[in-house]
Amino acid sequence: MAASENDVQTYTDTDFAMDTVVSETLYTTGDDINSKLTAVLTDVETNLLSWTNEKSQIYKVNADSGKDTEISDELSGYLKRLLKIAEDSDGAFDPTIGKLIRLWDIGGENQKIPEEAEIKNVLKDSGYQKIFLDGNTVHMEEGCSLDLGAAGKGIGCDRILKELETKKDVIAALMNLGGSSVMTYGSKPDGSSWNVAVTDPRAENEDDYLGVVALNGTEFLSTSGDYEKYFIENAVRYHHIMDPSTGYPAESGVTGVTVVCDSGLEADALSTACFVLGVEKGTQLLKAYGADGLFVDEDHHVYLTEGMKERFSLLADSYSVEDIAE
């Protein structure tokens, strides 16, 4: 028998993990409502994804570049799926550009515009074709550097889903990782949709939103934008989403991309790939994965895939919704 609304307690918490503010809302029928789900995210970061922590599997893979490295079933599964997205996006998403990301260090203490020679040098050590996966054995060509940061929060959300599925008293949940990665679990007690705000890429105030996306049941949302980490030099915006083919911040004409699908990893990786690809090519990639998406361009136009048209409500008056060219 389903629990009535009167039987359900609501638990909210705000914490910090994966270098961002994490807010959670749980609907539970049990007494122990303190789930500490952020501990799951910290474990993913520390033991799986970090490229600076020696405990991390990614750290070990990078340290052993040029050699075979044994990895867990979990990481092997993630890598297999990410390499497929890299291939399907023609390298617009590429998990091997770790050196390039650290060269620019956008959002870090040493952010800069690198010399052309520096960029060419690190690009020689990147390329998803340089990593080979055979079961639980991974081999990267020497000098290659793995960085799963573009899918990290999504992977964290996938792990949280597994954790929530073990908690019988939790009937629904919302996890928001800094606004860029959101997951919903189950249905709200009142049966309404989960409404998630999408940032206006050129908002003057943090509370100015582009619009709202409705999520239903268990779904994952990821947003990639040129406003998250960037600096401006000589009137040029240098943001953190790199085009692996050029070694420079992507210039596809879009300022933000939001993707909704049934996997955190895919939502994260696809939003990055679509930002690099732009509206038309990005839309085709989303179709291949059965994902919904919205694209925002530099001229304040919003482009919605067919599935996103049923989810999205525009709030910002300075934007207009346009059709995607076939």
Outline where the language-model segments fall:
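Mature catalytic core of soluble alpha/beta enzymes
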Residues: 1-326
